Each structure stands twice: as C-alpha cells, then as structure tokens.
C-alpha cells in the first residue's frame, strides 16, 4: 500500500520489521530498499542538502548500485551541484566498474570536461578495450573541444562496437570538421545499425 501511495518514508520505517519477520527474500528486501531510496531521492530532487543527507545515510552497496548512483548524480546536476554529481560517479566507479555508470559520466555536463577527460584517460590505461569507456572518452573530448582526439576515440569505439547513437555523434563531428563524405557514410551506417535502411529503389539525381 505504501509503495502504491509512494510513501517512501513510511516504507523505510517498515523495512526493519520486514527484515526481522523474514516475510520476504533477501533479494526482494534489497530491491524494496533500493526502491525506497530512489523514491526519496526523487522527492528531494531540488534540495541539494536533502539529497546529500539521503545519500550519506544510504548503505555502501546502494552507493555503488548503477541505477541509484546515476539517478543521484542526475538529480544533483539538475539541482545545480555539478561537482557533487561528478564526484559521486567517480567514487562509484572506483568501487564498482559498470558500463551504464561510465556512460552517465560521459554525458555529465559538469563544466569540467577536461578534468573528467583526464580521469577517464587514467581509467583507460587499465581498461583499453572497454567500449563504454571509449564512447565516454569521445564525448568528453567533444566537450573539451579536442576534435582530433574525439575523432580517434569515436573511430576506436565504432571499430569495436558499432551502434546508431555513436554513428550519429561521429557523423556530426565529421560534418563539423568539413568531411562531408565521411559524415554521409556514418549517417548511412547509423540507419543500418538502427535497422532503418531501406532496400526500396530510389531515384538518382540527373
């Protein structure tokens, strides 16, 4: 009932009793505790102090859970605490490497893109063939306006793992650099990767 009403504080108070009575499996209790924290974080969305307090009292395992740490960082960013969002993601990745968390780090516009890029390049020394990290490096290079480096990272990522999103971003970069043919080819590859390429005949320009 509390979950349906989204009364997360009431549910939090119930957790010790549910644990003691063993009416739920350990996995179900863990999922419920994560849902409670997620709901509380979203309710505190615009209050940086409350967000930080909730995170401070969270279990260590929750602070490493990808869905929770990425949501927490997004909420902090939207509340104007970009530095806290960056630190939360870096701390989580230090404890537990996860592709979704890495991708979230690459999308984070903290205003300190070069600092993030240096951190990500340090990680790459130990994970040279991580596809998610290569895409993050490409995006952070773009934010840092390091076009040549961004191109290298996109091409390395696409050689390893081709997907529509990366092709679209790469096409935008190449078009911006004036490489129209490469941009057009990347756009076609993006459509193919998304399953949108058509085998229907098309008119040719005269």
Give each language-model segment a name.
Residues 11, 50-51, 85, 116, ...:
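Single-residue signature of alpha-solenoid repeat helices
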Residues 1, 28, 68, 101-102, ...:
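TPR alpha-solenoid repeat register
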Residues 2, 76, 104-109, 141, ...:
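Residue at a conserved register position within TPR or TPR-like alpha-solenoid repeats
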Residues 1-57:
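Solenoidal tandem-repeat scaffolds enriched in leucines and small polar residues
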Residues 33-42, 87-159:
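Alpha-helical adaptor scaffolds
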Residues 1-24, 86-99, 158-164, 172-199:
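TPR/TPR-like (Sel1-like) alpha-helical repeat modules
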Residues 5, 45, 78-79, 108, ...:
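Structural motif corresponding to the intra-repeat A-B loop/turn of tetratricopeptide repeats
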